[in-house]
């Protein structure tokens, strides 16, 4: 299992016009882990940033850890390889360091990323992520992908995959939403016990759901005490829980700040206070898919 660099640059909701510069700056600042996905519709611009830095000799391809994700409309076994090669083409790369199943749910294949019925609910593809996984394993043996992982899997789904008869490639990470308002303790404990790392997306929360983690008085107090920003506290919190963290930003000052998290340590009391903020408050609920048999959030964790 390869070591995934602890802090990566998230590229979700990074507009194509901004993301190339963000990637170039991030590489200059020492980022080596880039989290991408077909669904973000900006992979070719991410790839341009990576290619320019490789061409300039700032980094070699093997110094980078590039992640992408298989979208839900491509869960049919016959569609997996094309989805992967399309991503590689967009990123202008020969291989991915890590390829994730973006969600455990398969959707009807076709033009639309999220095909909905007349009631506004997703149209499933009647595939099983266990079958999808077999096609992803083939990608490893064909040299297109070095490692596999999952995203948004609950513990039962991850267990089904880990216990699958004839499993050839183990998932190395479960990428999940994680921040102090949704600290995911039970799921993280489960993953770590089963030797699967956890990657935290939306570690800074976000403006959805009507809350701003950055304004939380406890987080601000701890930030002030350490002479750091609230974002740096939120990232450091996850690092000290042995998580991989992928904060998204296209703002130069924030891209810089988000990786300057290795020169201080939160105390045990800080960590306890941050853990006590849990409200089980999830931002990425994907409500149009609640009808799907593999919807991951109907159970506690």
UniProtKB/Swiss-Prot annotation:
Gene Ontology molecular-function annotations: 1,5-anhydro-D-fructose reductase activity
Entry-linked PROSITE patterns: ALDOKETO_REDUCTASE_1 (PS00798), ALDOKETO_REDUCTASE_2 (PS00062), ALDOKETO_REDUCTASE_3 (PS00063)
The protein's enzyme class: oxidoreductase
Main location: cytoplasm
Keyword NADP set for record: yes
Annotated positions binding NADP(+): 35, 175, 246-258
Gene3D superfamilies, per the entry: NADP-dependent oxidoreductase domain
Annotated keywords: Cytoplasm, NADP, Oxidoreductase
Annotated EC: 1.1.1.263
SUPFAM superfamilies assigned to the protein according to its UniProt record, in alphabetical order: NAD(P)-linked oxidoreductase
Regulation: Inhibited by p-chloromercuribenzoic acid and alkyliodines.
Quaternary structure and interacting proteins, as annotated: Monomer.
Family: Belongs to the aldo/keto reductase family.
UniProt protein name: 1,5-anhydro-D-fructose reductase
Gene name of the record: Akr1e2
């Amino acid at each position: 299992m390869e070591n995934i660099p602890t802090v990566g640059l998230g590229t979700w909701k990074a507009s194509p016009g901004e993301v190339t510069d963000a990637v170039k700056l991030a590489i200059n600042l020492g980022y080596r882990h880039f989290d991408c996905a077909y669904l973000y519709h900006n992979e070719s611009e991410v790839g341009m940033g990576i290619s320019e830095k490789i061409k300039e000799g700032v980094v070699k391809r093997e110094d980078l850890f590039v992640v992408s994700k298989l979208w839900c409309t491509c869960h049919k076994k016959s569609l997996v390889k094309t989805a992967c090669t399309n991503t590689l083409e967009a990123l202008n790369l020969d291989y991915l360091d890590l390829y994730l199943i973006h969600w455990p749910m398969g959707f009807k294949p076709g033009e639309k990323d999220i095909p909905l019925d007349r009631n506004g609910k997703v149209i499933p593809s009647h595939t099983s992520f266990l079958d999808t996984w077999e096609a992803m394993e083939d990608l490893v043996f064909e040299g297109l992908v070095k490692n596999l992982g999952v995203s948004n899997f609950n513990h039962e789904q991850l267990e089904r995959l880990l216990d699958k008869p004839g499993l050839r490639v183990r998932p190395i990470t479960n990428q999940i939403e994680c921040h102090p308002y949704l600290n995911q303790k039970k799921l993280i404990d489960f993953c770590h016990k089963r030797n699967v790392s956890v990657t935290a997306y939306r570690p800074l929360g976000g403006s959805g759901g009507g809350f701003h983690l950055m304004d939380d008085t406890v987080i601000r107090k701890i930030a002030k005490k350490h002479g750091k920003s609230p974002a740096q506290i939120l990232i450091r919190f996850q690092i000290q829980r042995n998580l991989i963290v992928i904060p998204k930003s296209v703002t130069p000052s924030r891209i810089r700040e988000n990786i300057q998290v290795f020169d201080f340590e939160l105390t045990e009391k800080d960590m306890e206070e941050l853990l006590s903020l849990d409200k089980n408050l999830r931002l990425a609920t994907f409500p149009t898919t609640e009808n799907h048999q593999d919807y991951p959030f109907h159970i506690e964790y």
